[in-house]
């Protein structure tokens, strides 16, 4: 975030609309008088809105103001959770024990709030029987139904079968679809 406010002597306008440190309107004053008031208060004169005529300036502690802005920005970045797509790769003839391990791995990804891309890779003549891959992917997505929902149905893409499971429930998916439909209608 660019913090490029003009302060004190950087302000070049002959007259400014002044706002006091408590937020009260002090009226339109000459820049010299506004700087004197700020100096008497032991604070800075900061140009808040340069677009208006005359520019709006406020008496405040500029260091404290800048610190507050950067702190707000950091807090808002912390609050955001970036959803990542994690991938779990399977084979159509996977053993039961290996399958349960992959299912546990996928569950931890979904519980942490990430989407899971389930990929069933076919080798050689395994592609002649894609229904085996569909069964494995279906079983995996059913194992994740209580904590997530199928966002993209299983489909064949080259030599692999791909399905995406997102965190949440089917109810949240329906709410998202309704909000998208309302956005498109407006």
Swiss-Prot record:
Q: Which InterPro entries match?
A: T_IF-3_C_sf, T_IF-3_N_sf, Translation_initiation_fac_3, Translation_initiation_fac_3_C, Translation_initiation_fac_3_N
Q: Where in the cell is it found?
A: Cytoplasm
Question: What's one Pfam family here?
Answer: IF3_C
* Principal subcellular localization: cytoplasm
> What does the subunit comment say?
Monomer.
By what name is this protein known? Translation initiation factor IF-3
- Supply the source organism's classification: Bacteria, Pseudomonadati, Chlamydiota, Chlamydiia, Chlamydiales
Q: Which UniProt keywords apply?
A: Cytoplasm, Initiation factor, Protein biosynthesis
What the record says about family reads: Belongs to the IF-3 family.
One GO MF term attached to the UniProt entry: translation initiation factor activity
The answer on whether this UniProt entry bears the keyword NAD reads no
Q: Name one GO cellular component term.
A: cytosol
Cross-referenced HAMAP family: IF_3
NCBIfam families assigned: infC
Organism domain of life: Bacteria
> Biological process (GO) annotations?
ribosome disassembly
Give the function comment from the record: IF-3 binds to the 30S ribosomal subunit and shifts the equilibrium between 70S ribosomes and their 50S and 30S subunits in favor of the free subunits, thus enhancing the availability of 30S subunits on which protein synthesis initiation begins.
């Amino acid at each position: 975030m660019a913090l490029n406010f003009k302060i004190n002597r950087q302000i070049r306008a002959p007259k400014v609309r002044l706002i006091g440190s408590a937020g009260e309107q002090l009226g339109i004053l000459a820049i010299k008088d506004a700087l004197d008031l700020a100096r008497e208060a032991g604070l800075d004169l900061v140009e808040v809105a340069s677009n208006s005529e005359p520019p709006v300036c406020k008496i405040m502690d500029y260091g404290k103001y800048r610190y507050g802005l950067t702190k707000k920005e950091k807090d808002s970045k912390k609050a955001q959770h970036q959803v990542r797509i994690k991938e779990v790769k399977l084979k159509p003839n996977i053993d039961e024990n290996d399958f349960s391990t992959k299912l546990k791995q996928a569950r931890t990804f979904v519980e942490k709030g990430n989407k899971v891309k389930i990929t069933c890779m076919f080798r050689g003549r395994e592609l002649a029987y894609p229904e085996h891959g569909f069964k494995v992917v279906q079983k995996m997505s059913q194992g994740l139904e209580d904590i997530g929902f199928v966002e993209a149905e299983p489909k064949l893409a080259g030599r692999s079968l791909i399905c995406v499971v997102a965190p949440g429930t089917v109810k949240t998916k329906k709410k998202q679809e309704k909000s998208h439909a309302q956005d498109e209608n407006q």
